[in-house]
Amino acid sequence: MGRVIRAQRKGAGSVFKSHTHHRKGPAKFRSLDFGERNGYLKGVVTEIIHDPGRGAPLARVTFRHPFRFKKQKELFVAAEGMYTGQFLYCGKKATLVVGNVLPLRSIPEGAVVCNVEHHVGDRGVLARASGDYAIVIAHNPDSDTTRIKLPSGSKKIVPSGCRAMIGQVAGGGRTEKPMLKAGNAYHKYRVKRNSWPKVRGVAMNPVEHPHGGGNHQHIGHASTVRRDAPPGQKVGLIAARRTGRLRGQAAASAAKAD
C-alpha cells in the first residue's frame, strides 16, 4: 500500500502560522476620522523600507495627531515616484498628486489609483501588489458608487466614499527579472510560506504519488480524475472539462478575449 501523499498531508495538522518575524507591520491607510472626511491632514514620508515577504516597498509616513500633542506613524504601500521628505495629504480636499489619499468621489474619471478600499473605512484592500493600479471608470452620483477597473481587468463597483491613493504601486516589473538560481527562490519563499521547492509527482516513487515510478518520467494513465475520487487518488487534472491545447474555435475565442 502506498504512503499518505503530499496532497493528503497538506490537509492535516495545525493552523498555518504566518512567517511574520521580520515583517514591518500591516500597510494600511489612517483610520477614517473627522479630519479626512471634511478637510485634509498633512504627513511627511520619513523613509521608504523593504518588507520581507512583500514585493512592494512600504513608506513610513508621520502625521501630527489631529487633537493631541503627539505624532502618528503609519505604514503605507509606496506609490511609484514617492520619496523621502515628500509631503502627503489625506482627505476630501487633498490635491491630485501621486501619493495623496482621497475618496473616490474626489478623483476624476480615468485617473490611475492604487490601494483602493472595498468598503468605506477598511483602510485599503484592492490593487496593492507591486506595479498594480486600478482605473476610475465612472461615477454614479445617484447611488453614490464608483466603477473601477482592477489589475485583473475585471470591473468592480464600490462606494464613492472609499479612499484610494493616487498613482500605481512601486516595484513594477519585479516578476520580469529571472530567478537565475535556486538560492534566490529559496530566500524569496522562506519569508513567505513553506511552498518551495515543489517536487513533481512523476519524479517520485510509486509509493509516494499516483504519477510516480516507471523507467522514464511519465504518468502512465490518464491525468484526469473524477470529482469524487478518494484522497490519495485525487491528483492531476481534477474534473477537467477538457485537456490539451486550445484548437479551432476555442483558440480563436481565447485570442479574442486577450
Curated annotation (Swiss-Prot):
Pfam families: Ribosomal_L2 (PF00181), Ribosomal_L2_C (PF03947)
SUPFAM superfamilies: Nucleic acid-binding proteins (SSF50249), Translation proteins SH3-like domain (SSF50104)
Transmembrane segments: none
Biological process, per Gene Ontology: translation
Keyword NAD set for record: no
Compartments, as annotated in UniProt: Cytoplasm
Region Disordered: start-end pairs: 210-230
Keyword annotations from UniProtKB, A to Z: Cytoplasm, Ribonucleoprotein, Ribosomal protein
SMART domains the record matches: Ribosomal_L2, Ribosomal_L2_C
Single GO cellular component term: cytosolic large ribosomal subunit
Molecular function terms from GO: mRNA binding; structural constituent of ribosome
Highest taxon above the source species: Eukaryota
HAMAP family for this protein: Ribosomal_uL2_A
Family: Belongs to the universal ribosomal protein uL2 family.
Name of the molecule in the record: Large ribosomal subunit protein uL2z
Organism ancestry: Eukaryota, Viridiplantae, Streptophyta, Embryophyta, Tracheophyta
Gene giving rise to this polypeptide: RPL8A
